[in-house]
Amino acid sequence: MSSEQQKLRWGIAWIYSSSNNTIITITDLTGAETVARVSGGQVVRADKDKPSPWAAMQAAYKAAQLALARGINAVHIKVRGPGGYGMKVPGPGASAAIRALARSGLVIGRIEDVTPIPHDIIRPPSGRKGRRV
């Protein structure tokens, strides 16, 4: 099939990548209907391997196969880090997950960073005086 004959069904791939895990969720364009949700902890056995790029790649391949089976063949990617008082950059699995989604046969549209950035001061979870040990 040529590219003009192939009908693209778009979805959104939400990649949340922290220093502890990587979670990939594929939804429809509205974001209301979840098509696939896979995390790094579902594809590895040891807890220490959850944030690794390898686990993120395997999770992205699995999510892409589920999305292709349900008819979504093109995605816009939204990458998110912890944000707030946490890291402002995504974890180690984000770029590996994007690469795996591109290699799995999905058409990639936009890639954007949706990490929540504070516009004022955020009080840390330990409070004003800090953690007293």
UniProtKB/Swiss-Prot annotation:
GO cellular component assignments: cytosolic small ribosomal subunit
GO biological process: translation
Quaternary data: Part of the 30S ribosomal subunit.
Keyword Membrane: no
Similarity comment: Belongs to the universal ribosomal protein uS11 family.
Disulfide-bonded cysteines: none
Lineage top rank: taxon: Archaea
UniProt-listed InterPro entries: Ribosomal_uS11, Ribosomal_uS11_archaeal, Ribosomal_uS11_CS, Ribosomal_uS11_sf
GO molecular function, one term: rRNA binding
Keyword RNA-binding applies: yes
PANTHER family to which the protein is assigned, alphabetical: 40S RIBOSOMAL PROTEIN S14/30S RIBOSOMAL PROTEIN S11
Upper classification of the organism: Archaea, Thermoproteota, Thermoprotei, Thermoproteales, Thermoproteaceae
The species this protein was found in: Pyrobaculum aerophilum (strain ATCC 51768 / DSM 7523 / JCM 9630 / CIP 104966 / NBRC 100827 / IM2)
Function: Located on the platform of the 30S subunit.
Assigned keywords, A-Z: Ribonucleoprotein, Ribosomal protein, RNA-binding, rRNA-binding
Record's protein name: Small ribosomal subunit protein uS11
